[in-house]
Amino acid sequence: MQKVCLCLAFVLAAVCILCSCSDLPAPSTSETVNPSVDVTLKKWEDCGASIDRAEEISGIEFGESLKNIVSVRAIPYTAIEVVCSLDKSVSDNTVTLRKAVSYAVKNSENLSGVNTNGLSPTMATFEIKGANFVNEKGETVVGEYNDNNYKYSFYCKKGLNGNQVHNYIKKMITE
């Protein structure tokens, strides 16, 4: 008799547990934990970085080789934007950009190399700790040229320490 009672008690307990579980709300499948943030070209937001706004550096006296640069903007974990003077020719601005890149490479531990050979006159390439810059399609490119305003933009792969990128740009234009 005791065995029967114990069995019934066990069955009742199991039924009660099952019933109480069925009242719980189903887990939501739409929630995502720490979604990866895509870096979008021309979209100047922090993209998950620990900063409040994009930082713009302009109106600074540059050395002779960097005088065409009117502004540099960098967003940690996202991108670097170098805007050259509108009253200069494409080739002048390209030379300026390449000099700026070379200067940064020589003066920063965060850059691992520079290569401007065999590229179009509007492109210059460099790497930050071996991570190439990529475009919106994820293709490995290193710069984007915009005919309208001589804007050159460099985009970092996600996960790269953008604070280092920002620091070398700041160093490049202040020394």
Where are these regions (language model features)?
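Positively charged n-region of N-terminal signal peptides that target proteins for export
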Residues: 1-6
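Repetitive helical segments and hydrophobic/amphipathic motifs
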Residues: 11-12
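C-terminal motif of bacterial Sec signal peptides marking the signal peptidase cleavage site
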Residues: 17-20
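Bacterial signal peptide processing site
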Residues: 22-24
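N-terminal hydrophobic targeting segments that direct proteins to the cell envelope
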Residues: 26-30
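Short, solvent-exposed recognition patches
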Residues: 33-140
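A short, solvent-exposed beta-edge/loop patch
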Residues: 118-175
